[in-house]
Regions:
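RNA-binding accessory domains that recognize and position tRNA/RNA substrates
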Residues: 2-3
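Catalytic cores of DNA base-excision repair glycosylases
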Residues: 6, 12, 25-224
Length: 225
């Protein structure tokens, strides 16, 4: 791998320093959610599907009830859509509800109730895109798999000064940086760290630069001074 990705892109060394500072911050500031207390790939998959366009605190209210009633793939595969809809109702976005039963049935029929361990297989499942697949692989299986959402794109743009395409989540340069970021001994921790950092520090609108451990080398901060 080349040390430099592109003229306006960070070096591998820069990305590693960035990662180590975020993980150090995470060690003292991590958020606690029930789906982070398990490495059960089924629970991680369903939690990540619930978290799409939904705040974590809303998902927290539903998570325990959902897995009390449907603790595994087989139970959710056999669930009636109307009953699933009742449990998931507080999340809103009712159009997502059918995907939960569908994904459980697909896993049962195609993978004998075992959640796939590759991005290629995961992304063939109902309701599973690149982000959810990467989250499952890194968080449940601790694989060196990348995740990119709009928050991570924002952080990369601000800190590194990366120029991206309009659809930043699919930008090949952003994905390349995310791949290097996740290439670490504990990708689960690294990816959870960047998610919390973008939720608590490098937030939309006005970031909390005063509390940011990255501010000294941040392209955004330097441009404001």
């Amino acid at each position: 791998m080349k040390n430099k990705l592109r003229e306006d892109m960070p070096s591998v060394k820069d990305i590693r320093i960035f990662r180590s500072r975020i993980i150090r911050w995470f060690n003292k500031n991590s958020r606690n959610y029930p789906w982070r207390e398990t490495c059960d790939p089924f629970k991680v998959l369903i939690a990540e599907m619930m978290l799409r366009r939904t705040k974590a605190d809303q998902v927290k209210q539903v998570y325990e009830r959902l897995f009390t009633e449907y603790p595994d793939v087989e139970a959710m595969a056999n669930a009636e859509d109307k009953k699933l809809e009742q449990v998931l109702y507080p999340l809103g976005l009712r159009w997502r509800t059918p995907a939960f039963g569908s994904v459980a049935r697909e896993v049962r029929e195609r993978y004998q109730c075992k959640i796939p361990e590759t991005r290629e297989e995961l992304t063939t499942l109902s309701g599973v895109g690149e982000y959810v697949a990467g989250a499952v692989l890194s968080i449940a299986y601790n694989k060196k798999e990348w995740i990119v959402d709009s928050n991570i794109v924002r952080l990369f743009r601000r800190y590194f000064g990366i120029k991206t395409s309009k659809e930043g989540r699919r930008d090949k340069h952003v994905i390349e940086v995310a791949k290097i970021y996740a290439s670490v001994r504990n990708p689960r921790k690294a990816n959870l760290a960047i998610l919390d950092f973008t939720a608590l520090i490098c937030i939309p609108g006005k970031p909390d630069c005063e509390k940011c451990p990255l501010r000294r080398n941040c392209h955004y901060v330097c441009s404001q001074s």
